[in-house]
Amino acid sequence: MKILLVFDFDNTIIDDNSDTWIVQCAPEKKLPLELKDSYKKGFWTEFMGRVFKYLGDEGVREDEMKRAMISMPFTPGMVELLNFIRKNKNKFDCIIISDSNSVFIDWVLEATNFHDVFDKVFTNPAAFDSNGHLTVEKHHTHSCTRCPQNLCKNVVLVEFVGEQLQQGVNYTRIVYIGDGGNDVCPVTFLKKNDIAMPRKGYALQKTLYRMCQNLEPMESSVVSWSSGVEIISYLQFLIKE
């Protein structure tokens, strides 16, 4: 039986936020104040739809956006980690659950030749329309009150594991590798044998630390990391067990 590795994308696989990184394509590399002020909490995807429309209206085209996106640096040790997973695909299934979008993630994985490492990518669907503007839609609708309207990562994870079980695939454990506030929901639903791996110094680690201080219930182990190389060491330990 395999281990399921679940990755966030922004500030986990790549060392930045793809949605804010793309702003460098805007005139003077910044957004107008009224556009920035139009963001409402929980409605990030709708906000990014307006950002992409603004970029398109300003004449920013697909090739320029792609060049910017594939220039994003990987998080330290992440290239080594993804190569390690590729060499051990008989032991791991690997998915991405991300609040970025399908175009950005595809560009990065294609440019770095890491598409084959991931069995599935769950994110907000995006495409260029007939005017050459990038458009983005919600990944799904859900009833979770803890998550943004467009994506509950826990719902996605539970559905994926359930579908795999129906196909006869049962995972020995889940290892969840992430950094952000929207990774808290799936991590708190992990079971006793699972491992939450928050990036050191980021929102997920701070929230889990606070939960621990408040004695809030959490079943999984927590192992923090700052480099993908540390994750390799831990995965090597797991597959030797």
Swiss-Prot record:
CDD domains: HAD_Pase. Keywords: Hydrolase, Magnesium, Metal-binding, Pyridoxal phosphate. It is an enzyme of class 3 (hydrolase). The lineage of its organism: Eukaryota, Metazoa, Chordata, Craniata, Vertebrata. This is Pyridoxal phosphate phosphatase PHOSPHO2. Substrate binds at D19, D99. The active site is at D8, D10. Mg(2+) binds at D8, D10, D179. Its cofactor is Mg(2+). Phosphatase that has high activity toward pyridoxal 5'-phosphate (PLP). Also active at much lower level toward pyrophosphate, phosphoethanolamine (PEA), phosphocholine (PCho), phospho-l-tyrosine, fructose-6-phosphate, p-nitrophenyl phosphate, and h-glycerophosphate. It catalyses: pyridoxal 5'-phosphate + H2O = pyridoxal + phosphate. Belongs to the HAD-like hydrolase superfamily. PHOSPHO family.
